[in-house]
Amino acid sequence: MTAQFIPPAKPILGDDERKAVDEVIASGMVAQGPQVHAFEDEFSSQVVDGVHCVAVNSGTSALHIGLLASGIGEGDEVIVPSFTFAATGNSVALSGAKPVFADVDPVTFTLD
């Protein structure tokens, strides 16, 4: 295990992103508004070859849905990186499986 601190990434957001967020907030439809449906439609048509997709409220929810769709559940063990956000292990536990943490390579940030 490394004792060296690995800094997390800083998001890069510009005027376009700020304007889009402002429009959503001003609409009052933050969870299931037209922008969410437009995103789901565009994502499913351009990224996942027309397979239906659903936007969720958090990374934890996204990981949880992915685990359930993959059949991961009680009695399973899932290897997860030790350098990660809490959602990684929490979503595994929420699915009924056991998260098993493994060290990451400090250069590549991949499982070591």
Ranges and model annotations:
Residues 1-30, 34:
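N-terminal "arm"/small-domain region of PLP-dependent enzymes with the aminotransferase-like
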Residues 24, 58-59, 83:
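Acidic/polar N-terminal loop/beta-strand segments that form early-domain functional surfaces
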Residues 84-89:
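Conserved coil-to-alpha-helix start sites within the AMP-binding
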